[in-house]
Amino acid sequence: MVPDAPVPLERLLVILFTVACLTVVSEVLGTVGLFRVVPLTIALACAGLGLAKIAPAGSAPGQHSIRTEAPPGIGAGSITAQTTKWVAVVAVFVVLGEWLTATVLALHNGVTALDSIWYHLPTAARFAQSGSTWRLHVIDTTSLAVFYPAGSEVIHAVGMEFLGTDALSRGLNVGWLIVGLLAAWCIGSRWGVGPLTLLAAAVVFATPQLVRVDAGQALNDMQVVALVLSAIAIIVTCAPAQGSWLPRGSVAAAGVAAGLAAGTKWPALAPVAALTIGIPFLVRRGDRVRSLVLWFAALLVCGGYWYARNLVHVGSPIPPLRIGIGRIHFTQIHPGLPTFSIVHSLASSGVWRRQFLPGLRLVFGPAWWSVVALSAAGIVAVVAARERRIWIMAFVGAATVIAYLLTEQAFDITQWSATARFAATGIALGLITFAIAVSRLSAKTQLLTLAFFGTTILATQFDAQLWKAWWRVGGLKVFFVALVGTAFMAIAGAVVSASRTTRFGPVRLAPVIVALVVVSVAAGAALDWYQPRFSGSRLPMLAAARKLQKRHVVHSRIALTGTLYAAGSQYYFYDKRLTNYVQFIGAPGAHHTVRLFQNCEAFIGSIAAGRYDYVVAEAAAGPSNPIRWLRSDPAAREIFVDPSGRIGLFEIVGPQRRTGCAG
């Protein structure tokens, strides 16, 4: 599809098409209820053989038709270029150290990020348990999470299906981190500044919020950033020369990456829409129709599944959004929680003082002003550029940030910093654009930019959120991280070695052999240390979960009911091998939504209909008090109720009756 691509881009394309193949095959099988190990294995093997057969043969090293454009006065062997490479290498290992530390901590303590245990992993577990990706999985009473795209959850579910645990989920985002760094390198390599653009991306990837909520967790922000950067990398790299038009095959390849991003989460629609607007300006006039057909086909195949599922089930691709023209409108389902828009508060000095400035510090670390200022400068600096490829990067970055500011977010303005990661793609593109634009001026400006980026990453390491709590686990963690770091160095050496020659003698294979040995030893240490279930978290809901763990409850049906507090803790009640069936229940509403139970009869009837063995109940404000209702039911035996009376755990020991309920 993209013949004669440089080696780094070839590696990136292999990763993208592997993920696309895995995603599409899983979605197709899941639609007919065949998301199982044997059908997956057969289908993936056939798809892999098909891709290998149609893939174009690569060029010999050094014979690629895609040319790079070195910055003026900066040769590959210059002091500036060498300094940039070494600083980039150090930055990569710093960022990997942050992410691997958090990942290893997650192996020890379990996944604890709210969104992970609220809907990411429960959705993935349901895919693996039911074998279906087509059914809507009710998560809570908000009418939001049930309709989210689940591209990342499918990948988690594949790991659960093959391994029987969520161990793969805890390391998946480190893989996306590496993809993001590789894509950033590919973007800059077109202008001969690959290490500098990699460093620019590392500035964002090292920020406290991304590390805290994505590293070792099941959130998908890093996946979206990596996929959008990959689409940009294909677009800016695959034109044969400056001013040349983008080939149709490259448009389709970029569409694959963009489609995967759109199928991962709704905020990715903004950069994907911006790319769609830019595609006609990057291809020949006579090729625009065919290129757009390929682009939209790739988007629909790789990212349209979840929107089609919503459309069939409830009558809208994005149910919370008002979509329509004139009298024709799709179904709109209003979220069951308050929302806010950041743009409405931008003119308030009080909000800036109390929320925005402290939030920026929390999200981006001590050097937040540098991250924001350099990113904004990169988007503005595009005015001086004369290339469409640089314009498209700045346009996508600006569109992502503007869409984030305009979009309605959940809860209220005091929670804005929790969603700032949605703008990470735009911030990263701003920094990358800044690196490219400034480095083309002179060697001095490149060194100055290098100093800014390096100092920003260094300053970020002094943020207490990154290291303070993570080094309390013990020396084994340090040992494990050191082993994994060594493995990464060996793998990096193998990749560099392979990129220089196609001959693999004993010397060339040595780094690969070392990497395999180190990973094997590290895996042994990890298995001895691995704790599958949330040993480090102290959330109140865990008291009920630990009661079930002590009873060794497996292969049981567990119902949860209550507010978002109960819904946000449901993954705690899965066992180590994910055999428990955990379901949030509520009074049925329209369009696959639920609400709090308002009477005892409906609540008890729902438990009986679901044949649940255990019920975890939260007593909400108002008439909804399932704990009192269960206490009045002779078929429910109380196992645990917390001192506040808010959370209760009950075992269903006999047939339930709907009459005579207390309330």
Predicted feature residues:
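Short periplasmic/luminal acceptor-recognition loop of GT-C membrane glycosyltransferases, typified by
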Residues: 535-542, 546-586, 612-620
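Membrane-interface helix-loop-helix junctions at transmembrane boundaries of multi-pass membrane enzymes
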Residues: 66-84, 189-197, 242-250, 283-294, ...
